[in-house]
Amino acid sequence: MAQVKAEYDFQSQPNTGELSISAGEVLTVIRENIDGGWIEGRNVRGSVGLFPESYVTPYQASRPPPVLPPPLPPTSSGPPAASSRPFDDWGGASEVAAPPSYGAQHHHQPTPSVPEVTRSSYPSQNDDFDDEWTDEDDEQEPTRPNVQSSIGSNSRRDLSRSHSEHGGPDRGSNKVNKNINRFSNFVKSGVEAYVIGESKTTSQISERHEVVMNNGIIQWKPIQQYYTCIVDKPKKESKLKGLKSFIAYSITSSLTNIQRQVSRRYKHFDWLHEQLSAKYVLIPIPPLPEKQVAGRYEEDLIDHRKHILQLWVNKICRHPVLSQSEVWLHFISCTDEKDWKNGKRRAEKDEYIGGAFLNCITVPHQPLDPNNVDMQVERFQRSVKTSEEAMRVMQERMNMFQKVFAGPVKQNWQKMGSAFKTLQQSFEIDETVASRRLTEALAYTASEYHEIGQVFDAHTKNDMEPVLENLYSYKGTVQNVPDIIQVHKQAVQKFRDSEGRLSSAEAEKMKQRIDAMSYTVIAEVQHQTAEKVEDMKSTMGTYLKKQAMFYQEVATKLTSLAARYD
């Protein structure tokens, strides 16, 4: 196989499938001419990944240097001359090119919507259960900047992909001269390798899923056994003799006859989200609650996070693929520390992630009409775009209602209560029986008006907050849809570009892989569309019922007050 030599250091970004290389390092080329100016290669340690093509030069092992004759004896018996070896030989030469500034301003995405080719290059090396996570506790890390303001104040992921403006070096001048797209998701997710039939896997498939045709509708095979998971009992815990503290949540699943309860931290949820995002490349993973530090142990914050986690768990349980995911089932059921660590390692070394996961999906044999596929995907994309805008407007109005009800409306009711109290005090001077009855009625009215103000405040949390949480969950899920659709479009285009250069047999096999990918995308479109309808029916129906109960409660109080003046 061809080899190349690194001319510059290149530092990989986490969770991208890139491979760090050092100047002078010799690498074996696996695949060249990858979109965006990349090479896939292997280093001497066996790690595989992508690195910029313009950072390396072709390398051929040179022949050993000829054996030189022994040096002539010195002609002088004086002390040896000081060595004239230049400082350059020690790595400090002034002529050594400075490494390029590639990626210096690269914007890191916590959970790319379409993840890396492989995680096997980054296995966990630590056997300690707690220390397998970073030393910084999840509850005490600095708040991540919220770069996705378009999704709302509680958004967690970045809607728009960042693209690096930096490229590789010019070998003559050591300056950047070529733009390299670090977010070539079609390549890095392994989808390109799948499309061209070069997915590299050595292990057997342990998790299989199926797309079926039901009355002409393409969909995931329905769930055979529905189950639920409850996120509850948030509890403050600590480690290192109290130096680090965090909130742990219990998860109780109905999957088995015996309800099993496990305890998980937010950091564990975050790890699971990363595994799901990496493996299920064409499935938008719902968002977790945002990580926050300020007031992290306040009751309202803990309760809010618990509700978002519950929504997240609900969506996973309802998904025909995610609900049967091995890493998910391990997450909700494993109580043994040793088994947990082994399962964690298995997930991190899983070969069937990204594009390779498509090998785990069985689809109908019937070929798909490309035009019909394009039409369905485009319609879904338009639906997502219009729904996002509509939900943004709903989110803004609901936020406004919350502020008004918890602020001016509550205050005005309670100010009216104070006015009734003042009126009551003015009638206390009269000592007649009639005035005494009126005084009692006014005093009770003042108290009830104050209570109605509190009811308006509670309404914002109990009735409005769930709507906002559901809007957050939906928008955080579909924000990944544009990237998924883009990867599908690139796969289809790859086939169209290659079709004329392939034999009929090769073209047919490639078309089958494209069809399998299209079946998967349409099945997911069908699921997401059905979920949106059911979620919105349930959310708005529940909200309006609570609205009616709320106003009935206020009306009942006012009717009762009016009767006191009869």
UniProtKB/Swiss-Prot annotation:
Residues 362-566 form the BAR domain. Residues 127-140 have a biased composition (Acidic residues). One of its GO terms (biological process) is phagolysosome assembly involved in apoptotic cell clearance. Pfam families: BAR_3_WASP_bdg (PF10456), PX (PF00787), SH3_9 (PF14604). It is found in: Cytoplasm; Cytoplasmic vesicle, Phagosome membrane. One of its GO terms (cellular component) is early phagosome. Residues 1-61 form the SH3 domain. Expressed in vulval precursor cells (VPCs) and apoptotic germ cells. Colocalizes with actin, dyn-1 and rab-5 in early phagosomes. Disruption phenotype: Aberrant vulval development, ectopic vulval induction, retained cell corpses and defective recruitment of dyn-1 and rab-7 to phagosomal surfaces. Involved in the signaling of vulval development by acting as a negative regulator of epidermal growth factor receptor (EGFR) signaling. Aids in phagosomal membrane tubule formation which is required for phagosomal fusion with endosomes and lysosomes. Also recruits rab-7 to phagosomes by an interaction with dyn-1. These are events leading to phagosome maturation which is a step in apoptotic cell corpse clearance. Binds phosphatidylinositol-3,4,5-trisphosphate. This is Sorting nexin lst-4. The gene is lst-4.
